[in-house]
Amino acid sequence: MKKVIEFYLSGDRVYSTREKAINQLYNNRGYGELKGNKLFLSLIEAAYLVERGWIKVLDEDRELTFEEIFKLGKRKDEDFDIKYLVYKDLRDRGYIVKSALKFGSHFRVYRKNAEHSDWLIWVLRESEKLSPNDMTARVRVAHGVRKNMVMAIVDEDNDVVYYKIEWIKF
């Protein structure tokens, strides 16, 4: 992308009405959610695209830095930092990453040009405890919607390791 696309802060997300944003980001690369003539991005998506230099985010007339967007995200979600690391890692690998809140997970992940997602991603810190019941519930939901459940574990060095959790029938 050559020219940076302007987005505007609106609560816990950003939006643009520019056709270029809709074509380049939504239609061609799977970013955001289209509602009417507005493309909405989550703060994680916005931070990622600002860091890449593809968009700029304005709050009133002031341009927000990557760090400011990150702080906004962290204020709204204490795990924003690790979710961002996982989001960035998956996007950098070429996957389309969307919210999976309605599935009880953090992200749903699509292969490029796929109509349906293959994976549900749950993000955890390495030091975090997860009960067997929590894990079972997440796997059941994933299985019920024909997705693979993946735990993305972020360690103290901010490295991400992915574990596929499966339901096995004997």
From Swiss-Prot:
Its EC number is 4.6.1.16. GO terms for molecular function: lyase activity; nucleic acid binding; tRNA-intron endonuclease activity. It holds the Pfam family tRNA_int_endo_N. It comes from the Archaea. The keyword tRNA processing applies. It catalyses: pretRNA = a 3'-half-tRNA molecule with a 5'-OH end + a 5'-half-tRNA molecule with a 2',3'-cyclic phosphate end + an intron with a 2',3'-cyclic phosphate and a 5'-hydroxyl terminus. The keyword tRNA processing applies. One of its GO terms (biological process) is tRNA splicing, via endonucleolytic cleavage and ligation. The active site is at 110, 116, 147. InterPro entries: tRNA_endonuc-like_dom_sf (IPR011856), tRNA_intron_Endo_cat-like_sf (IPR036167), tRNA_intron_Endonuc_cat-like (IPR006677), tRNA_intron_Endonuc_N (IPR006678), tRNA_intron_Endonuc_N_sf (IPR036740), tRNA_splic (IPR006676), tRNA_splic_arch_short (IPR016442). GO terms for cellular component: cytoplasm. Keywords: Lyase, tRNA processing. PANTHER family: TRNA-SPLICING ENDONUCLEASE SUBUNIT SEN2. Endonuclease that removes tRNA introns. Cleaves pre-tRNA at the 5'- and 3'-splice sites to release the intron. The products are an intron and two tRNA half-molecules bearing 2',3' cyclic phosphate and 5'-OH termini. Recognizes a pseudosymmetric substrate in which 2 bulged loops of 3 bases are separated by a stem of 4 bp. Belongs to the tRNA-intron endonuclease family. Archaeal short subfamily. Homotetramer; although the tetramer contains four active sites, only two participate in the cleavage. Therefore, it should be considered as a dimer of dimers. This is tRNA-splicing endonuclease. It comes from Pyrococcus abyssi (strain GE5 / Orsay). The gene is endA.
